[in-house]
Regions:
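Extended, composition-driven regions rather than compact fold-specific motifs
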Residues: 1-310
Length: 310
């Protein structure tokens, strides 16, 4: 790659919604495409798996419109009223493809958006319910020649364990597809995802590799995925009760977010993603109860219950 091929580190691309459909009961799957995506990092937009790469969607205010941000002057954009500029929200890319749009071959990204009910519904969820094919959407992401915004780094780990909630489902399912495609992999792989309903389990299980387990939420959010994770890690029942009753993250920490250190060949690698309170509980289970070294654990707090995120 020459200097001429390297774009700015952060770019804002105009895209068009070319498909929008409901998946299960809790997800809306969007496919967006546009020529400007061709200037993005190859590890985000080139056809194939995308691991846990995430992008920033510019959610327009009610009635449409909004202000397109200049990545070089993002503070100016953030200073505008939300009712004028809209909102910036983070989503993981589920899949990258190419499609024909307006007679030209262009990149396309599939993004699964969780629609939270009631008080947990934010502007992204509300917008997703009303989006239509043909709508425009601006997306911010890394420019070509730059690394994707992602944390997945298992190295040559001999054992991989992943766990998360519905917001982690797109990343974990993309990761599962990448792992399943590895030639003659000798890794021991376990992935468990808690989703809101049985309908979500059925919809997301379709085509998922056999080492992926999807479970429906019980009355207590996070309880089922923690129980399944404890089983995978061979941790006793008393530890489950302990982490479920643990304190929430300290008030001055918006999210739990820590990539793993470099993983040595054959070591275990644990990847935890989802709501920050859940992540803290699963991290305690993994490190304190199961005794896995902190450097082998990546934990990504994608959101925090009751708090806005941009």
């Amino acid at each position: 790659m020459t200097a001429m091929d390297v774009e700015a580190p952060i770019l804002c691309a105009q895209t068009t919604v070319i498909d929008a459909r409901t998946v299960g009961e809790s997800f809306i799957r969007l496919v967006v495409a546009g020529a400007e995506l061709a200037r993005w990092s190859a590890e985000v937009v080139d056809a194939g798996t995308v691991r846990d790469a995430y992008v920033k969607l510019i959610i327009p205010p009610p009635g449409g419109g909004g202000v397109v941000p200049d990545p070089a002057a993002i503070r100016d954009w953030l200073a505008l009223p939300e009712s004028e500029r809209g909102w910036m929200r983070t989503y993981t890319v589920r899949r990258a493809d190419t499609v024909v749009l307006d007679g030209a071959q262009v990149p396309a990204l599939t993004i699964d958006m969780v629609v939270h009910p009631g008080d947990d519904e934010g502007p992204g969820s509300s917008w997703a319910r009303s989006v239509a094919v043909g709508d425009e959407l601006h997306i911010v992401g890394p420019g070509r020649g730059h690394a994707p915004w992602a944390a997945w780094a298992p190295g040559q780990a001999g054992r991989i364990v992943c766990a998360g909630d519905e917001t982690a489902a797109p990343a974990l399912l993309a990761i599962a597809e990448e792992l399943a495609a590895e030639p003659s992999s000798a890794r021991e792989i376990s992935i468990v995802i808690e989703v809101p309903t049985e309908a979500d389990v059925r919809a997301l299980s379709d085509g998922a590799p056999e080492f992926v387990t999807l479970v429906a939420r019980t009355a207590v959010a996070g309880e089922e995925v923690i129980r399944r994770l404890a089983g995978i890690l061979d941790v006793g029942e008393e530890s489950i009760g302990s982490v479920m009753g643990g304190q929430r993250p300290a008030a001055d920490r918006d999210r739990e977010w820590h990539p793993a250190s470099e993983v040595s060949d054959g070591d275990p690698y644990v990847f935890l993603a989802g709501e920050s309170g859940l992540i803290k509980a699963m991290r305690r289970l993994t490190v304190d109860a199961a005794g896995i070294a902190k450097g082998s654990v990546a934990f990504m707090g994608y959101w925090r219950r009751g708090a806005a995120e941009s």
